Swiss-Prot record:
Obligatory cofactor(s): Mn(2+)
Keyword Cytoplasm on entry: yes
Pfam families referenced in this protein's UniProt entry, alphabetically: PEPCK_ATP
Co-factor remark: Binds 1 Mn(2+) ion per subunit.
Gene name as annotated: pckA
Assembly mode: Monomer.
Binding site for ATP: 185, 204, 220-228, 269, 305, 431
Species this protein is from: Pseudomonas fluorescens (strain Pf0-1)
Name of the protein in its database record: Phosphoenolpyruvate carboxykinase (ATP)
Stated role: Involved in the gluconeogenesis. Catalyzes the conversion of oxaloacetate (OAA) to phosphoenolpyruvate (PEP) through direct phosphoryl transfer between the nucleoside triphosphate and OAA.
């Protein structure tokens, strides 16, 4: 395609976007046909560069602070105009997509990118509707210009790059950011602000459906197993990361998956493996001279990624949605080796652990977190993406669980037999057996044992799981060391939870000293 230097390529096919990316030297093809790209010095999200415009509709509704940073409306207008003029002077790409699979809750989005590969990424991750914006809703605009360099003194940004959401104008500005995950998570944050007003709980979770129509949700931070565990060849995938839960429905906010690639194997993750083909994007994955991906090579980043459309998954929900969930699973990667592989939660415990969002940063998606693995608390299992006060999401969760009668479980995909460096991590087959037991209903009404310090109820037997693994204390050679580690973890939970204004019943549902 030879056009003027400021040509606009609108709604190109996937094939043409791949060709344009290759013609521009934006990436190369792996032997699977996937487009391989590099994102420069940013190989993860940059939380310190993300802002929300402060204006009347957001002033009192946002939980402002280090996560949701204020940006002045006048500065936004000036920067948008500057970035738009820069982009309009050169070739760029436009696609029209939806964010939200439910008819009542989709956003119509005009996505403009400077690069062909980021447009392809958006086409992988967002929804490509048969008919664009049938309800004629006011359009959102995403302007993503990777080569623009912000000047903090002039633009009011924190660095040379920024992500700024303007709810009043329905605009998302992404400048100087090559890591495409910023675009996906920005629109997730938009829906996370809008959906609660429609009585829909937005969730950082994966979802799948069984043959009988039963739905399972998998909450968890990056690296805890959402994508891997939801990609189950025996079930139909709804989505791997972002969903809404309304009365009678769980729907995908996206139209694709964004899988971590570190140590990816065909044996352990066959669904993901098969999805990485023509039309998919590999971000910061090292390939050899034969164009074969080396998923064990972390020389670029531990946060290597594959973006692919749901159409690449053979067994999926054709409508991109399902009914309300029978099982709600909170995935936590416990570095301390204190938590059991599975616990059965009541409503108050569900609220407590949802608000706590305890896990580890594993191969973190955030810049500046380093390669080290460390424990963290991330409210709603996704604090960086939830603009409203946490209590609003927790109240909606309890309302939905109570209304449908969903069963809730805490599943540890982290360590056992000792903490990180001493014990070992639960292997994927063991965790899959736990998930299968939950989905079969085997744990409903099961006999349990109460673990006092961490205040959790553990089933005495789980089909397919060694019984000695169920009570974590049994897996430690030094029982006294386990008891001390449990007290230390309980202290972390208690300290973290002091910031929440909730009922005494929810406060009492957590660990105790």
């Amino acid at each position: 395609m030879t056009q003027a230097n400021n040509a606009v390529y609108t709604d190109l096919s996937v094939d043409d976007l791949v060709k344009e990316a290759l013609n521009r030297g934006e990436g190369e093809l792996a032997d699977t046909g996937a487009l391989v790209v590099r994102t420069g010095h940013r190989t993860g999200r940059s939380p310190v560069d993300r802002f929300i415009v402060e204006e009347p509709s957001t002033q009192a509704a946002i939980a402002w602070g280090p996560i949701n940073r204020k940006f002045p409306a006048d500065k936004f207008d000036a920067l948008w105009a500057r970035v738009e003029a820069f982009n309009n002077a050169q070739e760029h790409f436009v696609s029209h997509v939806h964010v939200g699979a439910a008819e009542d809750h989709y956003l119509a989005v005009k996505m403009t990118t400077q690069t062909a590969w980021q447009n392809l990424f958006g086409r992988c991750l967002f929804i490509n509707p048969a008919q664009y914006n049938p309800a004629g809703r006011e359009e959102w605009q995403v302007l993503n210009v990777a080569n623009f360099e912000c000047v903090p003194e002039r633009d009011g940004t924190n660095s040379d790059g920024c992500v700024i959401i303007n709810f009043a104008q329905k605009k998302v500005l992404i400048a100087g950011m090559r890591y495409a995950g910023e675009m996906k998570k920005a629109m997730f944050s938009v829906q996370n602000f809008l959906l609660p007003a429609a009585d829909v709980l937005p969730m950082h979770c994966a979802a799948n459906i069984g043959e009988e129509g039963d739905v399972t949700l998998f909450f968890g931070l990056s690296g805890t197993g959402k994508t891997t565990l939801s990609a189950d060849e025996s079930r139909y995938l709804i989505g791997d990361d972002e969903h809404g839960w309304g009365e009678g429905v769980v729907f995908n906010i996206e139209g694709g998956c964004y899988a971590k690639c570190i140590d990816l194997s065909e044996k352990n993750e066959p669904v993901i493996w098969k999805a990485i083909k023509h039309g998919a994007v590999l971000e910061n994955v090292v390939i050899d001279d034969a164009k074969h991906a080396d998923y064990a090579d972390v020389s670029l980043t531990q946060n290597s990624r594959a973006a692919y459309p749901l159409e690449h998954v053979a067994k999926r929900s054709e409508k991109n949605l399902g009914g309300e969930p029978n099982a709600v699973i909170f995935l936590t990667c416990d570095l301390t080796g204190v938590l059991p592989p599975v616990s059965i939660l009541n409503e108050e415990q569900a609220a407590y652990h949802f608000l706590s969002g305890y896990t580890a940063l594993v191969g973190s998606t955030e810049m500046g977190s380093g390669s080290g693995i460390k424990s963290t608390f991330s409210t709603c299992f996704g604090a960086p993406f939830f603009p409203r006060p946490a209590g609003e999401y927790a109240e909606l969760l309890i309302k939905r669980i109570r209304g449908f009668g969903s069963k809730v479980y805490l599943v540890n995909t982290g360590w056992t037999g000792g903490g990180y460096g001493v014990g070992k991590r639960f292997n994927i087959p063991t965790t899959r057996a736990v998930i299968a037991a939950i989905q079969s209903g085997a744990l409903i009404g099961a006999a349990t044992e109460h673990l006092d310090t961490i205040n959790l109820d553990v089933p005495l037997a789980v089909p397919g799981v060694e019984t000695n693994l169920l009570n974590p204390r049994n897996t430690w050679a030094d029982k006294a060391a386990y008891d001390e580690a449990a007290k230390a973890l309980a202290g972390l939970f208690i300290e973290n939870f002091k910031k929440f204004e909730v009922s005494d019943a929810i406060k009492a549902a957590g660990p105790k000293l």
